[in-house]
Amino acid sequence: MWKLWGSWPEGDRVRIALIGHGPIAAHVAAHLPVGVQLTGALCRPGRDDAARAALGVSVAQALEGLPQRPDLLVDCAGHSGLRAHGLTALGAGVEVLTVSVGALADAVFCAELEDAARAGGTRLCLASGAIGALDALAAAAMGTGLQVTYTGRKPPQGWRGSRAEKVLDLKALTGPVTHFTGTARAAAQAYPKNANVAAAVALAGAGLDATRAELIADPGAAANIHEIAAEGAFGRFRFQIEGLPLPGNPRSSALTALSLLAALRQRGAAIRPSF
């Protein structure tokens, strides 16, 4: 069957390195599209053995320590990983693919990333992560009057280790409670491990400061639920996804890992979507 997504031409191969060695990185490494070769990984000091065991490749703490220069650096480690290696890679002309979209809520860091990419003649690519419909938002943003609200709903345990613990007793909840309302920029900055989706929605559509975000702890939620409500001159739409975790890893989004694999596959396609 003919597929829009295509694949890498036979004989062509792109070399990638990963930032991180957690569940998302391990899933990506285990399911690479044809034509994509994993040649190394970057990890924090002291994590070399764990990274080698998880990924089975050469490991370093800095890009220049890898035995082969990658064509693409894939960030699977979160904001800290992008901050540690993004600027260096982009400045050296290595393209970066990241799921840490919330890191761009820091306007200074975002500008530094853009400057580094321009200086290196490359680009920073943002994976869609745990959400969809970003293509529709991007199209709607070309019109007028766009208004967007993102709602993130998770079971209480999904908010552990976040700012929500400071305002809620997560173990005592008997019904849904909204613990954050504000801009997508503020959400991404206050919840760096939980609000990458809010930032992705905002950057695709109305922008970080014009997109409204609501974060909810809901003991009745069986999955992480992401919802986009948008309206403007184009019309209106509502999109919802109930995201499941990677098998055996309840805190890692399956769709986030799959979005990286999809981005890798699309890079090699002669015919592919424009989004």
From Swiss-Prot:
<protein>
    <recommendedName>
        <fullName>L-aspartate dehydrogenase</fullName>
        <ecNumber>1.4.1.21</ecNumber>
    </recommendedName>
</protein>
<dbReference type="Pfam" id="PF03447">
    <property type="entry name" value="NAD_binding_3"/>
</dbReference>
<feature type="binding site">
    <location>
        <position position="130"/>
    </location>
    <ligand>
        <name>NAD(+)</name>
    </ligand>
</feature>
<dbReference type="InterPro" id="IPR020626">
    <property type="entry name" value="Asp_DH_prok"/>
</dbReference>
<dbReference type="InterPro" id="IPR036291">
    <property type="entry name" value="NAD(P)-bd_dom_sf"/>
</dbReference>
<comment type="pathway">
    <text>Cofactor biosynthesis; NAD(+) biosynthesis; iminoaspartate from L-aspartate (dehydrogenase route): step 1/1.</text>
</comment>
<keyword id="KW-0521">NADP</keyword>
<dbReference type="GO" id="GO:0016639">
    <property type="term" value="F:oxidoreductase activity, acting on the CH-NH2 group of donors, NAD or NADP as acceptor"/>
</dbReference>
<dbReference type="GO" id="GO:0009435">
    <property type="term" value="P:NAD biosynthetic process"/>
</dbReference>
<keyword id="KW-0520">NAD</keyword>
<feature type="active site">
    <location>
        <position position="226"/>
    </location>
</feature>
<dbReference type="InterPro" id="IPR002811">
    <property type="entry name" value="Asp_DH"/>
</dbReference>
<feature type="binding site">
    <location>
        <position position="196"/>
    </location>
    <ligand>
        <name>NAD(+)</name>
    </ligand>
</feature>
<dbReference type="GO" id="GO:0033735">
    <property type="term" value="F:aspartate dehydrogenase activity"/>
</dbReference>
<comment type="function">
    <text>Specifically catalyzes the NAD or NADP-dependent dehydrogenation of L-aspartate to iminoaspartate.</text>
</comment>
<dbReference type="GO" id="GO:0050661">
    <property type="term" value="F:NADP binding"/>
</dbReference>
<dbReference type="InterPro" id="IPR011182">
    <property type="entry name" value="L-Asp_DH"/>
</dbReference>
<comment type="similarity">
    <text>Belongs to the L-aspartate dehydrogenase family.</text>
</comment>
<keyword id="KW-0662">Pyridine nucleotide biosynthesis</keyword>
<dbReference type="Pfam" id="PF01958">
    <property type="entry name" value="Asp_DH_C"/>
</dbReference>
<keyword id="KW-0560">Oxidoreductase</keyword>
<dbReference type="GO" id="GO:0051287">
    <property type="term" value="F:NAD binding"/>
</dbReference>
<dbReference type="InterPro" id="IPR005106">
    <property type="entry name" value="Asp/hSer_DH_NAD-bd"/>
</dbReference>
